[in-house]
């Protein structure tokens, strides 16, 4: 029996003639979960089983590669080769399988009200924002998991992240970008990054936070300080005067460059204006790609497919029935954009998340909201797929218990499984589901896995 580092147990099948033991584990198993497995061997007829001369119960093993188990009895020894195989098919994953109804039951604190998830180097990383009303305390933490359900905190010397911070993998490093700390006093005693003049509120944040890691444990501060006087550096100027969209930025990679759509900014005492600007990393700052400006919309879905950037849906201005968009635009160089479809079978939608399979040739759309015939906001429970970003089809046979959310976090692992975390269950505002009041936000903590086909 093989027990993984997360406590899951699987029984191997012995082939006596070939002297092999094969243990098949679920498709959702990550290689990182197999790095420290324990073994239980039930031997017969006083047979002893060892590894390198030691009893197997005394060791843990990296079972990403086969190991040899010598079995000795009455002076004779047979060498059995144990191989762990990650299944490449699982029927219930095609329809979707709920991995967790609430990831806070597996190590994420109960006070978390916002989080985002990345998949990096075989592990999941969650960047959380928590708040305890009793003492007005805020907590910004990093957690890691090998299976998406059991989470362990990553201890960092500095506070990383903030409400609306978003991760991206670029150049073999994991980045977490943006976010604000405007609710409560953080764990280092820093006051909220918000000020009020009696009739309106504004951010005091003058830094675009960016942290990176190459190993998941050692983090480097790559934050960019704003400067409102730099008229020749628009990014630093916007950051410096507090008018940049820090909350819910959309980072992505294209043509070996790091891009980012701005998130929601603070204006007139509220968050608004999501996805209004497209930026590309340029040394120690970002440069705006103005060619995308007329195609961007609030909460549009931006993704890369077949070596192109696509922009789908979104809302013109506030989120309303007449403002939702249906068109699709794309770009082959990240500079010049064009409309390639006025509408799709997805229909008017905003807040959907689109990812591609690891081959980069098929896109999948999750979540988002639309308006029904009665004019009510409805979360999209369908999952769509497309090979060209224009023609979309509904994937049939999806688990009826799956419910879509607004702006879910979707990551694709090496097994071509899409892991869907969180998002917002409802959207009651006009511009963004984010608020300066925790009780006004309605996050989901469910996690699902879907095999991409």
Question: What is each PLM-predicted segment?
Answer:
Residues 1-113, 453:
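Beta-rich interaction/scaffold domains
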Residues 90-453:
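Kelch-like beta-propeller repeat domains
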